[in-house]
Amino acid sequence: MKLEGSCHCRAVRFSLESHTPYPFNLCYCSICRKTTGAGGYAINIMGDVTTLKVKGRRNLAYYRARMNGGRSDARRHFCKKCGSHLWLADPSWPQWVYPPAAAIDTKLPKAPERVHLMLGSKASWVPVPKASRKDKHFKDYPEESIEGWHKRRGLYR
């Protein structure tokens, strides 16, 4: 599925192809919470890095999160003008980029269930739906990948 996204001021616009467009993964880690500023969590989508096209590249900056006394290898790309988080690129998975659903302008399909992950890092003020068939809870990361989740449900496009 072709996804188009942008920052708030539209100085940076991008497009990419995603086989995994369902916004199901809600991450409550402090990094996602603080870099996206949305509801205490971020919902990350996965896209093919070889299809990433960017307009306004000169307006991009990136941030490497502080982790375990050092810096993460992952780069969180932002707009220099308005500060919108646009995507994460991690050398551990060089074939993918991970834009937050909030940066996507294309209408996304509704996920049939949600995964709430990194709940061990959740801020105390953030409400989380009770665990159920439709809302799975994980203290850290689940074993199933974004790709695996989509494939198991026949949603991989």
Language model features by range: what are they?
Residues 1-6, 11-157:
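A short Gly-Trp-Pro
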